């Protein structure tokens, strides 16, 4: 039996097992589905939709090309990606997973970047957003806003470290391309010219651009929601059928190798599937805060198989390969964990110096309140935003379907 047939058999067996487990444990599957749906409905959809729509509009109106010309002298020498990568990096950090992959795929579809450049770009522009790191993890799970500064710093430095590491990726594939020896200093005139050229090349009317931005964004988020629910169910079923204990042998071995407490084996395994659940379980473990921070930082950097599956689904619409992205997630997990250890004293221990107690208490309290209020507001208005967006999507889709039928 060749490797291809073995691969097919393994995939078929896995999904057969998953289906049988769902049927045999309907209550656990239902509860896990509700948990995943609630997360998508209340938080993921409303937090990502505005960024997705605005990004589509910025690409459609040529503003991304304007930014790209200005950032070319910085992004090209440092990360070996075009200037538009700076826009993707900023939007990816602000909005969170999987925005970086979504924007990278769009730029590749627009032929603004090569395949190798897209693979480099996707590797370091996907990250958790600050609201999740501070509001959900630091304040929500650990009740410690100061920890958010450490986790966010390590997370985003890990992103940049991955970008620097991946800049050497694909050199052989680019040997045939002729690159300019010197990159000119950014010119506003050239940037405006690129903006105008891109706008003239866009033949769609304003209404069509707006409609496409909404429908494309909603369709992507529907797919993201499906993956969140699927992995929520899968993670729960692993625990129900006690496979978690079997798989935790690997995480326990890794923890022992790095001299970390083996009590973190189940939380680490859960986090490798879904970051929210894993981070919550880590916060409840009875080990030192530094050890918890190291594992949570790795989980945030690795992003979890749930997010990686979302990214794989997005990248599958292009010729961008998933393997470099997966390797980059492993690297970011390791880098982020190392940065936590390096920054522990300057960013956390020093912040909790007893001589700085008054300053610490004031800022920590204000920060906690701000992020708690922000997170609670998102959860409160999230369902309404999701419902309105889905209603708008249905109207646009129905209108286009009706017009298409009439023309046919």
From Swiss-Prot:
Membrane-related topology note: Multi-pass membrane protein
Subcellular location: Cell membrane
Gene Ontology cellular component annotations, sorted alphabetically: plasma membrane
Keywords per UniProt: Cell membrane, Membrane, Sporulation, Transmembrane, Transmembrane helix
GO BP term (any one): sporulation resulting in formation of a cellular spore
Keyword Thylakoid in annotation: no
Membrane-traversing stretches: 6-26, 43-63, 81-101, 131-151, 214-234, 294-314, 324-344, 377-397
Induction field: Expression is controlled by a sigma-E-regulated promoter which needs the sigma-E factor for the binding of the RNA polymerase and subsequent transcription.
One Pfam family it belongs to: Gate
Principal location class: membrane
Free-text function comment from the UniProt entry: Required for spore cortex formation.
Identification of the protein by name: Sporulation integral membrane protein YlbJ
Lineage of the organism: Bacteria, Bacillati, Bacillota, Bacilli, Bacillales
Gene from which this protein is expressed: ylbJ
């Amino acid at each position: 039996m060749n490797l291809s047939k073995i691969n097919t058999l393994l995939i078929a067996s896995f999904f057969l097992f998953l289906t049988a487990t769902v049927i045999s444990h309907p209550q656990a599957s239902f509860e896990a589905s509700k948990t995943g749906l609630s997360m998508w409905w209340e938080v993921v959809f409303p937090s990502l939709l505005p960024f997705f729509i605005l990004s589509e509009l910025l690409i459609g109106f040529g503003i991304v090309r304007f930014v790209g010309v200005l950032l070319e002298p910085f992004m090209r020498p440092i990360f070996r990606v075009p200037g538009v990568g700076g826009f993707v990096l900023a939007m990816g950090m602000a909005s969170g997973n999987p925005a970086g992959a979504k924007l990278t795929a769009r730029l590749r579809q627009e032929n603004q970047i090569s395949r190798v450049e897209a693979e480099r770009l996707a590797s370091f522009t996907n990250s958790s957003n600050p609201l999740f790191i501070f509001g959900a993890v630091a304040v929500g799970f650990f009740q410690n806003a100061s920890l958010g500064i450490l986790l966010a710093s390590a997370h985003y430095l890990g992103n940049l470290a991955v970008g620097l590491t991946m800049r050497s990726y694909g050199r052989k594939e680019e040997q045939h391309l002729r690159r300019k020896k010197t990159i000119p200093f950014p010119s506003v005139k050239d940037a405006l010219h690129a903006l105008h050229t891109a706008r003239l090349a866009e033949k769609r009317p304003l209404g069509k651009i707006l409609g496409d931005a909404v429908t494309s964004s909603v369709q992507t988020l529907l797919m993201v929601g499906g993956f969140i629910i699927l992995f929520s169910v899968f993670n729960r079923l692993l625990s129900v059928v006690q496979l978690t204990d079997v798989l935790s042998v690997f995480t326990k071995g890794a923890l022992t190798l790095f001299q970390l407490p083996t009590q973190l084996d189940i939380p680490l395994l859960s986090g490798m599937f879904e970051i929210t659940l894993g981070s919550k379980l880590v916060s409840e473990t009875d080990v030192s805060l530094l050890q918890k921070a190291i594992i949570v930082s790795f989980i945030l950097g690795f992003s979890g198989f749930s997010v990686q599956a979302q990214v794989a689904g997005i990248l599958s619409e292009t010729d961008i390969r998933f393997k470099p992205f997966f390797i980059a997630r492993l690297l970011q997990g390791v880098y982020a964990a190392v940065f936590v250890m390096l920054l522990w004293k300057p960013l956390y221990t020093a912040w909790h110096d007893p001589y700085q107690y008054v300053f610490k208490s004031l800022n920590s309290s204000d920060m906690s309140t701000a992020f708690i209020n922000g997170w609670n507001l998102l959860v409160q208005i999230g369902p309404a935003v999701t419902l309105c967006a889905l209603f708008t999507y249905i109207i646009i889709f129905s209108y286009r379907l009706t017009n298409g039928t009439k023309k046919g």
